[in-house]
Amino acid sequence: MIRFAPSPTGDMHIGNLRVAIFNYIEAKKRNERFLIRIEDTDIERNIEGKDQEILQILDTFGLQYDDVVYQSKNFSFHQNFAYKLLNEGKAFACFCTPQELEKEREQAKKEKRAYRYSGKCENITLDEASQRGEPFVVRIKKPTGTIEFDDIIKGHLAFEPNEVDSFVILRADARPTYNFACAVDDMLYDITLVIRGEDHVSNTPKQIHIRNLLGYDKKIEYAHLPIILNEEGKKMSKRDKASSVKWLLEEGFLPEAIANYLILLGNKTPKEIFTLDEAIAWFDLKNISKAPAKFDIEKLRFINRAHLQMMSEEELEKALGVDEGLGALAKIYLEEASTLKELNTKIDLVLHGKRENETFREEIETLRNLLKSMELPESFDEFKKELMQKSGLKGKKFFKPLRILLTGSEHGPELSELYPAIKNRIKEVIQ
């Protein structure tokens, strides 16, 4: 089984979405079940409704999953496994106060060294811990040897015992920590591959260590994706609007175009424009670059326009939420618009834009009055010829006011292109 494990603590960002897409693709390629595991153990930070929002986004992107589970439902399993390690002497009760630990951290900072747990409580026996009757956290004992694994993207990685350290697996209120819950759940659901961001690299040896001490011997593969940088070359954060999947969708980027771009980002692909189903056929995690990739909104706009151009007029009408027959108009405006939002603005201008211009006020009025009573011919050439004759206007004094009257704008596609698409609405829009 392959899993995508988001936390319901905020809006989904493009880094999360990329992880979801890659996990979905690998599940399809390997013919494995795709699990959504909502990691809701951080109760204080959970935001109500964010889990449903995440699932809705996955649906929007066509990432079909087989099951949804909540990590908090497995608390009893996490606790039992933690007490098992405690009873076997592979973990210990730690009574160190937050103040004591902070003092140790400050000391490490002064000495310019990485903080490591002092080991103060490591030799307290289970009997002694029980007799004290005080709250305690459970810490797993640090490994005795190097923890090594092969990352599909990063290659061979090794972590010394001190880097893994004796870390907390169960809080004083008996809730599991992130790493412990994650390691146990990957065992419970028989996860075979974990794809996630490289900010989790330091968590991986801890999770391997937990499973080793629990006697789990099934191999789990790992692939840690490099971070996505913003246009200034810094790590993308919530301050970057484009990092929010919700914002991208609201701006009129298509789910299929966003997916296309995220698969393309820092990857070797046989072509630039493709669908999710096409990517499943050739996608290979080994082709992902180890280096961070820079997010380029202009590149996304280019890809989005390509996907819009591939849509039929009917599909465009549905995506834009416009009346039947306006797909042809949308197709024409794709020469100068790259998103659904921009297309809607262009179409709205044609249908509802102000037909006013001080320079050509008289000409606009003349043309408007003629068009109200004129029977519109099929071809633009006939239309232009008849209107020129009836109005007595020509050149700039004809074409400029005609464009303003028909489109609500001084610039845009050729009127000969636009005419067939708006002919049936001309009398309506010039009012």
From Swiss-Prot:
GO BP: glutamyl-tRNA aminoacylation
InterPro entries, per database record:
aa-tRNA-synth_I_cd-bd, aa-tRNA-synth_I_codon-bd_sub2, aa-tRNA-synth_I_CS, aa_tRNA-synth_I_cd-bd_sf, Glu-tRNA-ligase_bac/mito, Glu/Gln-tRNA-synth, Glu/Gln-tRNA-synth_Ib_cat-dom, GluQ/Sye
User: Which controlled-vocabulary keywords does the entry list?
Assistant: Aminoacyl-tRNA synthetase, ATP-binding, Cytoplasm, Ligase, Nucleotide-binding, Protein biosynthesis
State the compartments where it is located: Cytoplasm
GO molecular function annotations of the record: ATP binding; glutamate-tRNA ligase activity; tRNA binding
Gene3D superfamilies attached to this UniProt entry? 1.10.10.350, HUPs
Query: In terms of domain of life, where is this protein from?
Result: Bacteria
Primary localization: cytoplasm
For this protein, the record's Pfam families field holds: Anticodon_2 (PF19269), tRNA-synt_1c (PF00749)
- Catalytic reactions on record: tRNA(Glu) + L-glutamate + ATP = L-glutamyl-tRNA(Glu) + AMP + diphosphate
Broadest EC class assigned to this enzyme: ligase
Quaternary form? Monomer.
Matching entries from HAMAP family are given as: Glu_tRNA_synth_type1
What family name appears in the similarity comment? Answer: Belongs to the class-I aminoacyl-tRNA synthetase family. Glutamate--tRNA ligase type 1 subfamily.
Q: State the name under which the record lists this protein.
A: Glutamate--tRNA ligase 1
Identify the species of origin: Nitratiruptor sp. (strain SB155-2)
The organism's taxonomy opens as: Bacteria, Pseudomonadati, Campylobacterota, Epsilonproteobacteria, Nautiliales
